[in-house]
Amino acid sequence: MKVKVGINGYGTIGKRVAYAVTRQDDMKLIGVTKTKPDFEAYRAKELGIPVYAAGEEFLPRFENAGFEVAGTLSDLLEKVDVIVDATPGGMGAKNKAVYEKAGVKAIFQGGEKASTAEVSFVAQANYEKALGKDYVRVVSCNTTGLIRTLSAVQEYIDYVYAVMIRRAADPNDIKHGPINAIKPSVTVPSHHGPDVQTVIPINIETSAFVVPTTIMHVHSIMVELKKPLEAKDVIDIFENTTRVLLFEKEKGFESTAQLIEFARDLHREWNNLYEIAVWKESISVRGNRLFYIQAVHQESDVVPENIDAIRAMFEMADKWESIRKTNQSLGILK
Amino acid sequence: MKVKVGINGYGTIGKRVAYAVTRQDDMKLIGVTKTKPDFEAYRAKELGIPVYAAGEEFLPRFENAGFEVAGTLSDLLEKVDVIVDATPGGMGAKNKAVYEKAGVKAIFQGGEKASTAEVSFVAQANYEKALGKDYVRVVSCNTTGLIRTLSAVQEYIDYVYAVMIRRAADPNDIKHGPINAIKPSVTVPSHHGPDVQTVIPINIETSAFVVPTTIMHVHSIMVELKKPLEAKDVIDIFENTTRVLLFEKEKGFESTAQLIEFARDLHREWNNLYEIAVWKESISVRGNRLFYIQAVHQESDVVPENIDAIRAMFEMADKWESIRKTNQSLGILK
Amino acid sequence: MKVKVGINGYGTIGKRVAYAVTRQDDMKLIGVTKTKPDFEAYRAKELGIPVYAAGEEFLPRFENAGFEVAGTLSDLLEKVDVIVDATPGGMGAKNKAVYEKAGVKAIFQGGEKASTAEVSFVAQANYEKALGKDYVRVVSCNTTGLIRTLSAVQEYIDYVYAVMIRRAADPNDIKHGPINAIKPSVTVPSHHGPDVQTVIPINIETSAFVVPTTIMHVHSIMVELKKPLEAKDVIDIFENTTRVLLFEKEKGFESTAQLIEFARDLHREWNNLYEIAVWKESISVRGNRLFYIQAVHQESDVVPENIDAIRAMFEMADKWESIRKTNQSLGILK
Amino acid sequence: MKVKVGINGYGTIGKRVAYAVTRQDDMKLIGVTKTKPDFEAYRAKELGIPVYAAGEEFLPRFENAGFEVAGTLSDLLEKVDVIVDATPGGMGAKNKAVYEKAGVKAIFQGGEKASTAEVSFVAQANYEKALGKDYVRVVSCNTTGLIRTLSAVQEYIDYVYAVMIRRAADPNDIKHGPINAIKPSVTVPSHHGPDVQTVIPINIETSAFVVPTTIMHVHSIMVELKKPLEAKDVIDIFENTTRVLLFEKEKGFESTAQLIEFARDLHREWNNLYEIAVWKESISVRGNRLFYIQAVHQESDVVPENIDAIRAMFEMADKWESIRKTNQSLGILK
C-alpha cells in the first residue's frame, strides 16, 4: 500500500516535493493545487499530475483560460492520506482547520510558526519525534541548513553564533529587491536561533542580512566548543554526515555560483543541491572556537525532509531506512 | 562508422557540446581538453570522458593535483576526425594551424572571425553550405538567435534594426561586471549586423548593450517589410520554425527568469533552452513594420548547431535529417 | 511678488523640486507634505521647510513619533498659488479635485494620464503652450529624455524607433526587482511613443525593457530622416541644445556608472544629472538613418521642467528667460 | 605656513582626499597625478588643480589627447612636503623608494602591508603614534570602520568576532563581479582581524564575504564582554564617539540604500558618508555578549584619517584639535 500524497501549492517547494514523491516506491502523488493556470500548471498537466484549484474562488481563472481542473482542494483532500502544505508563509496555519476537518495528516513548511504542528522536523536530527504524528513542520531552508551541520557536532557545542547572508529572491521571483543594497534584520539576535532550538537543544544566536542574489544563502558559523576538536575531526565528521558535502575552493568552488554549476553539471533536476555545501578550507579551529562557512540551496534543501516526514508520520520506515531511500531516489550523493 | 569527435576547451560551450555528442548515434566523443584540474575536469572523469591537457604547459597543474590526464591536445588530435574548438574568443584562430597540421577538421565558435573558417553556420539557414567543408564557424549565441527567427521571415525583409540587451556574464562567471550599470557598445551599428550577413544576405543594423544579469540575452527586433505580413502570419511562421518557441506573458512568462524556469521545469540538463524564445504577445505589425521580442539562452542555443555542423562536414545526413536527429536527441521541442 | 509653491509628496521627485524652488528668486517654498515621519521628513524640518501631513489620516503617525506638523494638505493648499503634485503615479488624478476646490493651480508628473492636465510639457519643446494654464503635466523622465533630443532634430524626422532600457528601481527603493532578469513590456509598441506625441507631433514607436540597475535609463534611438543630415551636424545641434550634453567613451564614459560619477565629481546635489547624456561616438548616420544612444537620470531630469512650468503658468517669464534662470540656478551646464 | 600636499593617484580615494585638503586652512594642494587623461583628469583641471603624469611612461597618452600636464610625479615630489599615495593596493610599497629618494613624507592606504609604514593609523584610536612620523598607513575602509566603534568600547572587550559583508565593486567600477553570487574568503579567520591589531590591541577574529552591491560594506559584530555593559550604555558611548552615527530603522533606514540617501539628502559631495553608521535597534546585549550592526561607506570613511595623519606627521595639532578641524571642514556631523 502506498501513501496517497497531495500537495497544496505547486510553486518553488511544492513542485519539487511533488517530483520527489513520484520518485518514491512507497508513495503516490494524487494531485496538486494551483491558484492560476500559469505555465507551472500546464507543466503539471503535461506530466500527468491532476491539477486542482486551490479554492473555489480560483475556479473562474481556470475556466476562463479553458484549463480543466480535477476539482478543488476539498476534492483533493478526500483522496489523500497526507497533504503537504507548500503555500506562502503564514497561510498554512489558516489551512490547518481545513485539513483537520478533512481528517488528513499535514506537513507544513518553515514559513509557519512551530506551534502550527506537533513537531518541527529535520530528518537526521529528530526523525523519531515525528513517528505517528498528524502535523509536522519541516523547518525553513536556513534552519535546516544550520541543523544539518550543527547536529553533527552537537556534543561539542557550548555556544553557536551564526551570521546568515540570505538571497533576496528566488530565481523565478522578479518582484522583490533589493537590486543594490544590503538589508540587515536589525533585531539581533534574529529569529533563526530559536527556530533551530525547536529541533535541537543548543545554545545559539544569529544575525541575518539580505543581499542582491537569487541562487543560495551563505552562513558564517562560529562555534564555541565545550570539548576539544580539531579541524580534521570536523572534516571527518562532515564527510560522514548525510546531506552535507565538502567543497574545495582549490577545485574552483569560489562562490555560490560554482556550487550551483556543480548541481547543473550533475544534471540535477532544477539544479537542486539538496545537500548543504561546506567549504572545506573554511573549517578551522582556533583555541576553543570552530569556524566554518556553508551554503544552502533555498529551493531544494528541505525537499528530502518532506519525504522523510511522510514516512515518519505513517511509520513506514525507521530513520536511516527512510533517509537512505530518499537519498537514493533523489540522487543525493551521501 | 561513427565520427570521432574531440572538444578543445571544456567550459560553458565545450561541456554542453560534449554532452550533445554523447547523445548522437552517429558520433563518438573521444576526449576533451582542460587547462586545469577544476571541478569540471573531475566531472568529466566521473562521466568516463578522457581528459587531455590543453597544452604541455598545463601538465604540471594536473600532476601537482594528482589528476591523471590521457595526454595533451596533440595526442587527442591524433585520435579524432574533427575537433570542436570551444576555447575563449580569439584563441581558435591561433589553434587553427595546429588542427591543420594534425589533418583534422575543425569547428570554431562565434568568438572567432568569419575568416577563420570556410563558412559561417546556422543549420536551418545554410546547412548545405557546410557540406564537406573542413573548417566551419558556428556563429555566436546572439547571431544564431537573430538568424533563427529572421531567416524564417527572410523573404519579407526589407531592413532589420535589432537592439540587443546582453547578459554581462554567464552564471558561472563571477569575475565580470557591471553590477549596477548599463554599458552600451558606443559604435553604432554594432558588429552583430555584419555577422548575421555572413550567414544570410539581409539588410540589418544593430545596437548592443550590456546589463547586469547572467541568464539570457534579449533582442528587440524591428523589421521593415517589403511585402505585406500580418502578426498572425508571423505567429504561424514561428510556430512552424524549428528551434523557435513562442511564450505567452499571460501564462506567466513575464521575464527571462520564467523562461529559464520553464527549462528547469522540463529538467533540461543545465537548464538549457536550445530554442529561441519569442514572446507571442510582442509580435505585432504596424504599417509596414513588424516588431517582436525574443530571448536567447547564451549558454546553449549554439549547441545543436555544433552537432549539425559535424554532420554537414562529413556529409552524414541532409539538412532536415540532421536537424531532426539533433532535436530528438536533445529534447528540443520542435 | 514671488509665486508661493507647495509640494505634495516629498519623495524622489518632490524633494528635488522643493530644493529647486528654493534656488529661484521668483518663487517661495511654502511647505511640503509627507505621509510618515521618516528621515526625509526630519531632513525637511532641519532645512526649515514646513512639513504638512498629506492627509488627516496620516496625523496619528506623526503624533505617535512626536513629530510636529504644520497642518495637513488642506492647510497647505490655503497658503499656496500652485501645488506640485509629486505623489505616486495615478494619485495625482485623484488629487485634482482637491486642488480645484482649493482654487490652486497644479503641476502633475508623468505618472498621470495626459488628460489629467490641459497640456503636457517639456520646456524647450512647448513652453508657450503652458502660458497661463491652470493644470500642466510634466511628462515622465523617459519621455522628457526622448523629447529633449528629438525636438532638436524634429524637422529631419520622418520616423523614430526608440528602445528604452529602464532601471528597475530608484537607488532608494529596495522593494522592487528583478535582481537577475530582463523584463520586456510585451505590448509593442509601448506607451512611450504616444506619450511623446502629447508634446511634439512626430511619428514614433518604442519598445521598453526593465533591467536590474538603479541609476539611469538608456535609450537606443534610430531616426529615419526625411532630409539629409550628417553625424557632425547632429553633434553641432546637440552641442547647441539646452539640457543635452555629449559624453565621450574615449574620456572614460563607458557606462551609466561614469555618467553618475561625473555628476558626483561636480558635487551636484543628489548627483543630479539634469541634462540628457548622449554618447558622442554613438551618433552616426547610415543612409537615411540616424542612430544615437542616450542616458537619462530618472531622479532629476524632470526637475527643471517643473520649475519652468511654474513660470509659464504664471506668465512670469518667456521661454528662454525661464530656461536660462532655471539652468543657472541649478548649475545646469548649458 | 601651510603644509604642501601632493596626491599620487586621483581615483576614488585620491580625489576625495584632494578635495578634503582644499578644505583645510593649514594645508595646500600642490597637485595630483593621473595615468591617463580621462574625465577625472579634466575635472581636476577645471578645478584648477595641477595634473601631473604618474610616470614618464604615461606622457604619450596625455600628449596624444592634447592634455597638458604640469610634469611628472618626480616634478610633483619636488614641490611637496608630503605625498598621499592613493594608488591601487600593493603599488604604494613599490612607490616608497621614490618618495624616500625625494625626501618627502608619505601616507599609504590600507591596500599596503602594515610594514610599508612606521605606523598604522586611525585618528581617534592612535593619533599620537603618528606624531612626527615620515611614513604612515591609513588602514582600509573596513578596518577603519571596525576600529572606530570597537575602540570606543575597547575596555569592555574580551573577544570580538566580526563578519564582514563587502560590496564587490565601487559605483564607478564596472569591471568586477560577481553579478549574482556570494563569494566567501574561505580562509577563516580572514586577514581583517590582524589588521585591526596593527592599531588597537584587541582579541578579534573575522570572516569576510563579497556580495553583488556597490554602495557600502556591512559588518555584523559580536563582542564578548569582560565586564558588564548594557545596550543603553553602548548607545550612549556611540552617541559620544566621533565619526560614528546612530541610525534608526524606524525612521526608514532599512538598508544601506537609505544610508546613502541620507548622505545625498545632506548634499554631501559624492554622497560621502565619512561616519560609520550603526543601526541603533541592532545594539543589544545578551548575557556577556554585545551585538551590533554597522555599515561603512568604502569610498569615503578613510578620507578624514588621511587629513588627520598629515597633521600628526607634521605635529600641526594635537589629536582632538585635528579631529575637530577635519570634522568641521568636511561637515562631519560629530
From Swiss-Prot, chains A, B, C, D:
It is found in: Cytoplasm. GO terms for molecular function: 4-hydroxy-tetrahydrodipicolinate reductase; glyceraldehyde-3-phosphate dehydrogenase (NAD+) (phosphorylating) activity; glyceraldehyde-3-phosphate dehydrogenase (NADP+) (phosphorylating) activity; NAD binding; NADP binding. Pfam families: DapB_N, Gp_dh_C. NAD(+) binds at residues 12-13, 111, 167, 298. It comes from the Archaea. Keywords: Cytoplasm, Glycolysis, NAD, NADP, Oxidoreductase. D-glyceraldehyde 3-phosphate binds at residues 140-142, 192-193. It is an enzyme of class 1 (oxidoreductase). Its EC number is 1.2.1.59. Transmembrane segments: none annotated. The keyword Cytoplasm applies. Gene3D superfamilies: Dihydrodipicolinate Reductase, domain 2, NAD(P)-binding Rossmann-like Domain. The keyword Transmembrane does not apply. Homotetramer. Belongs to the glyceraldehyde-3-phosphate dehydrogenase family. HAMAP family: G3P_dehdrog_arch. This is Glyceraldehyde-3-phosphate dehydrogenase. The gene is gap.
